[in-house]
Design a protein with these regions (language model features):
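C-terminal and inter-domain tail/linker signature
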Residues: 1-128
Length: 128
């Protein structure tokens, strides 16, 4: 794979870990462009919106942890397939996270699609 795409995947994985697992906005903001645009309807735009989201996690889901199962990169986009747990011992959620990097290689835009992991499934394939 192209070295630039691998760098993009690593960069976004580090950013994601700082947000969700470490809940460290001060370090995460260095990965963000100033125009950071959020498409999750529950989170505000700009770096300040992400800071508020991290504070929400610290207060309401301090044990939240996510594992990146796989990642993909194409051009300025990085996609993560994630197993997210708000609390230990739960089934959690399957999440697709999409990030777009700006001309300086910083995270500039974010989308996500979130699906609860059900207790039972119509097939044996699992979500990951």
């Amino acid at each position: 794979m192209d070295a630039a795409l691998e760098r993009n995947k690593q960069f976004v994985a580090e950013f994601y870990d700082l947000i969700i697992n470490q809940k460290d906005f001060e370090r995460a903001k260095k990965y963000m462009g100033p125009r950071y645009k959020q498409h999750n309807p529950l989170v505000k735009d700009r770096p300040e919106g992400l800071r508020e989201f991290i504070e929400f996690l610290k207060t309401n889901a301090p044990e939240a942890h996510s594992e990146i199962i796989r990642s993909f990169a194409e051009g300025d986009y990085v996609i993560l397939h994630v197993h997210s747990l708000r609390q230990p011992g739960t089934r959690g959620r399957a999440i697709i996270e999409i990030f777009r990097l700006d001309e300086n290689g910083l995270v500039d835009e974010h989308w996500d699609v979130i699906q609860e992991i059900p207790e039972t499934s119509a097939n044996p394939n699992g979500m990951f």
